[in-house]
From Swiss-Prot:
Name of the protein: Uncharacterized protein Rv2203
Compartment(s): Membrane
This protein's UniProt keywords: Membrane, Transmembrane, Transmembrane helix
Transmembrane is among the record's keywords: yes
Domain of life: Bacteria
Region (Disordered): 1-57
UniProt topology in membrane: Single-pass membrane protein
Gene Ontology CC entries for this record: extracellular region; membrane
Ranges annotated as spanning the membrane: 75-95
Biased composition (Low complexity): 38-55
Keyword Membrane listed: yes
Main subcellular location: membrane
């Protein structure tokens, strides 16, 4: 009668049974090379584009991607805009200089300038205080509330003028310098009769500052150009 089965089938009564030899059908173990030569690297190099990328700042972090810089483009646009503004300002200045005399020629021509200066000199000769004050205030006459000091100055100016001349007549406008469309400086010649007596003199020059306002030409100031005693 056979005895109980052994828990280890490999162990019998006659000793341990040998392990079966591997058959030819079983896969053989792969032998890895223990020494890799320098001619054959263990891993093939990556694409050429990977070499151009900058190294990562930290391990495991992908390299930074380089974006195209727009600084050069913005600088070029700024230069173009600045040149355009300078060109526009230059053209405006040149246009204003060229058209200044043309726009003011009708207002400050010799005729209106001569009439305004003659009227102011007549006011000094005749002691017309209101006309002297209106011209001397140079456009702000209507806004000034107290004109007593201006009237006193007008009387003094008239007295000084009458001590020099008994009669004055503007004979020519020698030069007009335009400051703007509404302002001009005028050099003129007048024939004067000295208050002390004597023959008239016709080569006396004066300078007047004119202002055009509300259709009127005002003589803001008057200076005798020729020195001498009358």
């Amino acid at each position: 009668m056979p005895g109980p089965h052994s828990p280890n089938p490999g162990v019998g009564t006659n000793g341990p049974a040998p392990y079966p030899e591997p058959s030819s059908h079983e896969p053989q173990a792969l032998d890895y090379p223990h020494d890799l030569g320098a001619a054959e690297p263990a891993f093939a190099p990556g694409p050429a584009d990977d070499a151009a990328l900058p190294p990562a700042a930290y391990p495991g972090v992908p390299p930074q991607v380089s974006y195209p810089k727009r600084r050069h483009k913005r600088l070029l646009i700024g230069i173009v805009v600045a040149l355009a503004l300078v060109s526009a300002m230059t053209a405006a200045i040149i246009y204003g200089v060229r058209t200044n005399g043309a726009n003011t020629a009708g207002t400050f021509s010799e005729g209106p300038a001569k009439t305004a200066i003659q009227g102011y000199l007549n006011a000094l000769e005749n002691r017309d205080v209101d006309t002297i004050v209106r011209n001397a205030l140079c456009g702000i006459h209507d806004g000034v509330r107290d004109k007593r000091s201006d009237q006193a100055l007008a009387k003094l100016s008239s007295d000084a003028f009458r001590k020099q001349f008994s009669q004055v007549e503007v004979t020519s406008i020698d030069k007009i310098v335009y400051w703007s469309q509404y302002q001009a400086q005028v050099l003129f010649t007048m024939q004067v009769t000295p208050a002390a007596g004597g023959p008239p003199r016709g080569q006396v020059q004066g300078i007047a500052q004119l202002l055009f306002q509300r259709g009127q030409v005002l003589v803001c100031s008057y200076v005798l150009r020729t020195a001498g005693s009358y």
